[in-house]
Regions:
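Residue-level recognition of beta-strand termini and adjacent short loop/turns
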Residues: 42-43
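Mixed-charge, low-complexity intrinsically disordered regions
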Residues: 1-34, 46, 50-123
Length: 123
């Protein structure tokens, strides 16, 4: 499986396994946030990372909004990143859990290290 290395707030790196089908979501690493989009392009063992967008204080309103303490992708981000894919959530061990074809409202942000329990009750 394809992996990416994410630098954590304490300076160490964590290897994250990418899914083998389309994915859009965000990674939280300490105070750093990234919108990630990838898609399977070669085989079930190779995926191509399409985009990683760093979310900064200056641009975060373009990509995420908060409702009831939960972050969601904005319409702009959802339409930009979602292309015939399915949403995957990041588990604590660095693997992805498929959560199905999302609507924008169900495209809930799953953070690096913890998840929204209503989206991933097994987390």
């Amino acid at each position: 499986m394809e992996t990416i290395k994410i630098k954590q707030a304490n300076g160490s790196e964590k290897t994250v396994i990418l899914p083998v089908r389309g994915m859009v979501g965000t990674l939280h690493v300490g105070s750093d946030r990234y919108v990630v989009c990838c898609k399977a392009v070669i085989s079930n063992k190779k995926v191509r990372l399409m985009n990683i967008y760093d979310i900064t204080e200056d641009n975060k309103d373009q990509y995420i909004y908060e409702k009831n303490g939960v972050e969601y992708l904005t319409d702009e981000a959802f339409n930009k990143f979602m292309r015939d894919g399915e949403l995957y959530s990041l588990r604590k061990n660095g693997t992805w859990r498929e959560v199905g074809i999302p609507t924008r409202e169900s495209c809930c942000i799953v953070t690096f290290g913890y998840a929204n329990p209503h989206l991933d009750p097994d987390f």
